[in-house]
């Protein structure tokens, strides 16, 4: 194994090249090694580590929707990248077009390689001619002074799930992760109504929601005039402020969806400020195409854009919103021309830090379609898979497209991020009896697995279509929360997983799920008398203690 082209060994080193200088240290830590340091100059795409590639690897996509899966490193074929969604596939798509790529970390049986942060550079791994190579992508930005390297750890132990959990703990410590003690439950409009939501249907569900164990009532995409024009409503919707008022009057925490780093070509904000977006050759650069429109990315290096973002979210907070689902966040990190000479990752972090400052420490931010590592420490919850859907999706390609099957798979393979990076959002439960192709068993499989994983539980249905079976599944899912989950065979290639969780509201539980046959087997050991206590340490980590006494 080589580090910055040198034989791997403990110590402090200096690498001086024509365009850049790296000062780095290799130190022994629990279960492995840590490489840290600093760089100045023009490092470009900086090679950090090189070693022999394993055959079977767990690879990870850089953002919420992308797959996290086990693949054969030597039989991998690069995917066809949809030009409309180029940057959801990779922020360095030229790599993915040629090689197997994994962002932030990569795992094999008994070993995990993982970067602990993404504050300036984009960290990724590529398999090149039988070798696993770790890179830091600096996007051709020049640094006059030294800036910190994103630290890299190499962890080894026969227990691979333990290594992934340890890696996630180190990431949480490095980034002062936000891990709320309380996990909100709620309702979301999207997976029943999509863009056809009306205020009349919203009010109907608001009344029905009082019969469900929900705290948050979140309005998703459909209310806004256009992408970017978030404070102007359409159709029969009242003002954004009135929506929050009515939700709060009915006893719920008001929640709202935005895609804050995106503006459509038809939006007022773009037409009034065409210079606010990331450019290519001096012209607005399409970040992606959706809603039958070109979508541009806000230039988050511009002070006036950050001021606009702050005003937007501080206004939403003043209106009463306390739950913010912020979506399509990858747009903030697309490569391109920005006003300031900073990396796309630095720009993204400026944007998300501005939103956090605007909504306050007591608001809940749910990230979605987001770069993962750069968001740690800013969001409270994070979507960690593609959109679910009212169908299983056995014929849907595993490329981030909506499907219940792949959404649940990612909740399983990214399980270790939960309670360490943030709260994992596996996407919404769909429990209605009509207007869905999901079978009763598929609904149970999805819901119970999310419960055993201790994930966020948000339901998305026309609540008038949820009958006794759906209510029973929701109740039983909530009773599976509160534990410490572990996917024991995380390196499974056949989509069959064994998940255990200790200390849940139902005691110690185990669920064996098969995402191909859609079968599951749930075992409960019975309730324990142990009470779970959460203590937040000074370094930001949550520690979990189980004490004798009545359960909470």
From Swiss-Prot:
Catalytic activity: Hydrolysis of terminal, non-reducing alpha-D-galactose residues in alpha-D-galactosides, including galactose oligosaccharides, galactomannans and galactolipids
Activity modulation: Inhibited by hydrolysis product alpha-galactopyranose and to a lesser extent by beta-galactopyranose, its mutarotational product. Inhibited by synthetic cyclopropyl carbasugars.
Keywords recorded for this protein, A-Z: Carbohydrate metabolism, Glycosidase, Hydrolase
EC number: 3.2.1.22
Pfam family, one: GalA_N
SUPFAM superfamilies, per database record: (Trans)glycosidases, Galactose mutarotase-like
Domain of life where this protein originates: Bacteria
InterPro entries the record matches: Aldolase_TIM, Alpha-glycosidase_related, Gal_mutarotase_sf_dom, GalA_N, Glycoside_hydrolase_SF
Outcome, altering residue 387 to G: 1500-fold lower catalytic rate and 1000-fold lower catalytic efficiency than the wild-type enzyme with p-nitrophenyl-alpha-D-galactopyranoside as substrate
Binding site for substrate: 65, 191, 220-221, 325-327, 368, 383
Functional note: Hydrolyzes the short-chain alpha-galactosaccharides raffinose, melibiose and stachyose.
Family: Belongs to the glycosyl hydrolase 36 family.
Summary of subunit composition and partner proteins: Homodimer.
PANTHER family: ALPHA-GALACTOSIDASE C-RELATED, GLYCOSIDASE FAMILY 31
Protein name: Alpha-galactosidase
């Amino acid at each position: 194994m080589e580090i910055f082209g040198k034989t791997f060994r403990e110590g402090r080193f200096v690498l001086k090249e024509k365009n850049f200088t790296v000062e780095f240290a290799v130190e022994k830590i629990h279960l492995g090694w840590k490489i840290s340091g600093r760089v100045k100059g023009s490092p470009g795409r900086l090679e950090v580590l090189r070693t022999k590639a394993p055959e079977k690897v767990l690879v990870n996509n850089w953002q919420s929707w992308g797959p996290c899966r086990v693949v054969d490193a030597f039989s991998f074929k690069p995917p066809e990248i949809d030009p409309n969604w180029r940057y959801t596939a990779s922020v360095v798509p030229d790599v993915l077009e040629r090689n197997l790529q994994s962002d932030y970390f990569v795992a094999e049986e008994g070993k995990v390689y993982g970067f602990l942060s993404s504050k300036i550079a984009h960290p990724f791994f590529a398999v090149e001619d039988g070798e696993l190579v770790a890179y830091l992508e600096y996007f051709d930005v020049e640094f006059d002074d030294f800036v910190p390297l994103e630290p890299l750890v190499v962890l080894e132990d026969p227990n691979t799930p333990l290594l992934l959990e340890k890696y996630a703990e180190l990431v949480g410590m490095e980034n002062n992760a936000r891990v709320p003690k309380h996990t909100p439950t709620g309702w979301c409009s999207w997976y029943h109504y999509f863009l056809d939501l009306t205020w009349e249907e919203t009010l109907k569900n608001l009344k029905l929601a009082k019969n469900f164990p929900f705290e948050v009532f979140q309005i998703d995409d459909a209310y806004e005039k256009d992408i970017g024009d978030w404070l102007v409503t359409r159709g029969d919707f009242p003002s954004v402020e009135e929506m929050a008022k009515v939700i709060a009057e009915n006893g719920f925490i008001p929640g709202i969806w935005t895609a804050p780093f995106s503006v459509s070509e038809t939006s007022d904000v773009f037409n009034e400020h065409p210079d606010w977006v990331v450019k290519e050759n001096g012209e607005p650069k399409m970040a992606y195409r959706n809603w039958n429109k070109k979508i541009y990315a806000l230039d988050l290096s511009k002070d006036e854009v950050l001021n606009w973002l702050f005003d937007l979210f501080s206004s939403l907070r003043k209106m009463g919103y306390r739950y913010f689902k912020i979506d399509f966040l990858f747009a903030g990190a697309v490569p391109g021309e920005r006003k300031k000479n900073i990396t796309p990752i630095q720009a993204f972090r400026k944007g998300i830090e501005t939103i956090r400052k605007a909504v306050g420490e007591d608001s809940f931010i749910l990230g979605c379609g987001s770069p993962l590592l750069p968001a740690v420490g800013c969001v409270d919850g994070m979507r960690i898979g593609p959109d679910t859907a009212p169908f299983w999706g056995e014929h849907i390609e595993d490329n981030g497209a909506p499907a219940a099957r792949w959404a649940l798979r990612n909740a399983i393979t990214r399980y270790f991020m939960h309670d360490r990076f943030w709260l994992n959002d596996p996407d919404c439960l769909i429990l209605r009896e009509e207007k869905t192709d999901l079978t009763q068993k598929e609904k149970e499989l999805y819901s119970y697995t999310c419960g055993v994983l201790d994930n966020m539980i948000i339901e998305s249905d026309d609540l008038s279509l949820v009958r006794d079976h759906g209510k029973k599944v929701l109740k039983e899912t909530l009773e599976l929360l509160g534990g410490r989950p572990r996917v024991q065979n995380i390196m499974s290639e056949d989509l069959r997983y064994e998940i255990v969780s200790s200390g849940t509201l139902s005691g110690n539980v185990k669920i064996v799920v098969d995402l191909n046959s859609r079968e599951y087997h749930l075992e409960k050991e019975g309730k324990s008398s142990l009470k779970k206590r959460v203590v937040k340490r000074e370094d930001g980590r949550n520690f979990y203690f189980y004490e004798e006494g009545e359960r909470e």
